[in-house]
Amino acid sequence: MTKNNQSISYKDAGVDIDAGNALVEAIKPIAKATARPEVSTSLGGFGALFELPMDKYKNPLLVSGTDGVGTKLRLAIESGKHDQVGIDLVAMCVNDLIVQGAEPLFFLDYYATGKLDIYTARDVVAGIGEGCQQSGCALIGGETAEMPGMYPDGDYDLAGFCVGIVEKADLIDGTKVKAGDVLLGLASSGPHSNGYSLIRKIIEVNGANLNEECDGQPLIDALMAPTRIYVKSILALMKQIEIHAISHITGGGLLENLPRVMPNNTKAKVDTKSWNRPAVFDWIQTHGNVEFHEMHRTLNCGIGMVVVVDEKDQQAAIDALTAQGEVVSVIGKIESSESETPEVDLV
């Protein structure tokens, strides 16, 4: 029994069920706009149903992935820019699937906060919906967790989960990579969703003005540009040529992500002057006095995805990707190496 016979509600404890229900209603149209024919449920149920398109596949493989946005969220929270980090969340997941040739099918999100702000959450989910539309996958469910005492006021965290499908014979796993193959770099929109702990430290040390101009726009806009989603461009390319490997350039940069899709005894020789690096990376390197090696093992430095193709398919691949709106640069080649483990040589 409480003192003075006071009745304590869940809302008194910091959890507003009505706010949660209102959010579900607010995001139903967002989810509906992403629907695919295979989806047979709507938001609000205990589980989401998705009928696999078995008539399109002989031997399908399901490919799954999960990711977050990292400390880019801190910049979003501090700047009040919540409408694009949802795109980042989807991008980080679906870009990981497409490197294996998998078409994203459906996506789920997890939104955790200390006190639910319906408007902030709705903006975030609207971005998730936009990311799902860009990648052609359905937003079929999620979880909103209001956990008083776990997060400071105004803070939230995100996680995303995605499942895709690929014909087993079409799986892209890097085993076909060989000396002489060409590295095609697809331009990024900025830092994407990696390296923000470094970026935030540089902002702090410099006392940077986030409204200062960077390549014709406020610095904060350059830093918060949503991660580019490459799914539809890669799916279109797969129909035209054989892709030997794809690497999503995330945390670890070119130095650590290219070897993940290369066989032993190979080296990727990359010309770092072969593409136009966005000005935001110049700002980061200059204001942080960041060394060359550190830049390329922390940030994508202007290349968000690398596609490895046979030399004979180079121009066809460039034409196909350009037709999809990608900015493509020939950034290097695969060479033979005496090292048993894959190497990257940046010049």
UniProtKB/Swiss-Prot annotation:
GO process annotations (BP): 'de novo' IMP biosynthetic process; adenine biosynthetic process
E.C. no: 6.3.3.1
Record has Nucleotide-binding as a keyword: yes
UniProt-recorded name of the protein: Phosphoribosylformylglycinamidine cyclo-ligase
InterPro entries: PurM-like_C_dom, PurM-like_C_sf, PurM-like_N, PurM-like_N_sf, PurM_cligase
HAMAP family, sorted: AIRS
GO terms, molecular function: ATP binding; phosphoribosylamine-glycine ligase activity; phosphoribosylformylglycinamidine cyclo-ligase activity
Organism phylogeny: Bacteria, Pseudomonadati, Pseudomonadota, Gammaproteobacteria, Thiotrichales
Entry's localization field: Cytoplasm
Broad enzyme group: ligase
Natural source organism: Hydrogenovibrio crunogenus (strain DSM 25203 / XCL-2) (Thiomicrospira crunogena)
Pathway membership, UniProt: Purine metabolism; IMP biosynthesis via de novo pathway; 5-amino-1-(5-phospho-D-ribosyl)imidazole from N(2)-formyl-N(1)-(5-phospho-D-ribosyl)glycinamide: step 2/2
Chain's gene name: purM
Record keywords: ATP-binding, Cytoplasm, Ligase, Nucleotide-binding, Purine biosynthesis
